[in-house]
């Protein structure tokens, strides 16, 4: 493992990659679906076994190899108690897959991000940037949350002040998705005063920005 990490991240002995992306809670490769606060109420927030036993030790190893490492983090889903089936009925939605963030929990979910950034800082890791949602237009992932452009903008309107109020320097990247999902050639129209970048994933499509 160390040899692979050194070949990947060492600026002198390897490729010198200095940017990694991690999940806030579970992702496609997790052994089970979970968030960092599965019980209602942020008093239950805590890093889980996957973070403590696997993610953090590897991040520490990478940081020892390349101290210039930047970490971006994104959730695959919000806690299920924050989900609704749709924005018309606001019916609670208990599935890990699909659903929407309940507008009533935007402020709470923003604090969820703050708690994560602070928890990682307490473990010795600076979160350089967050994105509000992994693949926000993908309804079918094992753990997912549908977040339209309008929903993401409304959430960022809560997230940006929450990060600033907590005296954190973490950036916000938006549209954490494939290049070919919108085919928009520029960032014009995005709220650039609080958003640092489009964070398009290189899974599909041609780069337009």
Regions found by a protein language model. Name each.
Residues 1-127, 147-153, 157:
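N-terminal catalytic cores of secreted or lumenal carbohydrate-active enzymes
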């Amino acid at each position: 493992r160390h040899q692979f990490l050194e070949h990947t991240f060492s600026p002198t002995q390897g490729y010198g990659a200095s940017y990694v992306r991690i999940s806030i809670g579970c992702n496609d490769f997790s052994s089970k679906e979970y968030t960092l606060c599965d019980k209602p109420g942020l008093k239950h927030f805590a890093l889980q076994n996957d973070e403590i036993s696997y993610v953090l030790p590897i991040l520490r190893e990478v940081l020892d190899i390349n101290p210039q490492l930047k970490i971006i983090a994104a959730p695959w889903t919000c806690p299920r108690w924050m989900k609704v089936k749709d924005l018309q009925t606001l019916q609670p939605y208990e599935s890990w897959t699909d659903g929407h963030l309940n507008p009533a929990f935007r402020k709470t979910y923003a604090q969820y991000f703050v708690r994560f950034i602070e928890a990682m800082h307490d473990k010795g890791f600076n979160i350089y940037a967050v994105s509000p949602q992994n693949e926000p237009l993908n309804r079918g992932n094992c753990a997912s949350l549908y977040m339209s452009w309008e929903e993401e903008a409304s959430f960022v309107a809560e997230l940006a002040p929450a990060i600033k109020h907590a005296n954190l320097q973490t950036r916000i990247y938006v549209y954490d998705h494939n290049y070919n999902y919108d085919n928009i050639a520029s960032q014009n129209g995005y709220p650039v005063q609080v958003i640092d970048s489009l964070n398009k994933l290189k899974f599909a499509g041609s780069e337009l920005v």
